[in-house]
Amino acid sequence: MEITKTLPKDFPRNPNKFCDFCGYKNYCYKGDDLMILPENKRRDLNEVTKKTIWLYGKPFSGKTTFANKFPEPLMLNTDGNIKFVDAPYIPIKDEVSVTGRLTHRKFAWQIFKEAVDELEKKENSFKTIIVDLLEDLYEYCRLYMYDQLGITHESDDSFRAWDKVRIEFLSTIKRLMNLDYENIILISHEDTSKDITRKSGDKVTAIKPNLNDKVANKIAGMVDIVARVYVDEKQRVLSFKSDEVVFGGGRLKLRAKEINLDYEKFEEVYKCI
């Protein structure tokens, strides 16, 4: 004979001393729902509360100095070039310690991830987070993943390694870009080593950040603006141009294609959206 057990449909509340350790206590007692929907009201797009920017340019063009002018900055620095900026910084580099005859290495990528963990807690007074340089972080991520996968290059495990490195890097950068700070700035060097062929057949030099194309396109989708910094006749320029030659632009409706590399003038760009 088949026995069918009827499952209860009602689960009456049974308050006890263990309720204090339950993550659903407020929901059970007060009806608080953490997944509440936003108010059905259009947002004011002119009220910008967070800026995300990706700057790139040749060395000594003024990228780091410009980023240093943003309020309450913290630099996550990979190349050690912090002599002429006064922002507090975290050096992102391998840490090597020796215990007896054993050498222990902590990868730079692990240092960066720990910094992101701390920044997520918001137990600080920083308003601007600066990554200088982004391509160095990508290389650090590669080296860390080589160690994790037991390989010396992505081609050693071509079916998985490329994707694993890219996913590890982009998912961590996305965590950084989602942090609740007023300004998040990424800095890269400029790459002019590749030529492209225009529709007319002419070959020209592409101007873009020094980062893998697939990764660069993903990063561009995480920021408001991709801007190039260059020096023109002793004047430093911040360019938002984007065409088949120059990598740049963004999701903002910018009135000016170029401005002087000046913090106050850049602030006006957001005010004039």
Residue ranges, per PLM feature:
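P-loop NTPase motor core
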Residues: 133-217
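Structured loop/turn residues at beta-strand edges in well-structured enzyme cores
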Residues: 17, 68, 124, 179-180, ...
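Conserved GTP-binding G-domain of TRAFAC-class P-loop NTPases and closely related GTPase folds
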Residues: 178, 191-273
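Conserved P-loop
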Residues: 36-131, 135-140
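Short, well-ordered beta-strand core segments
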Residues: 73-75, 184, 226-228
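RecB-family 4Fe-4S metal-dependent nuclease core
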Residues: 1-35
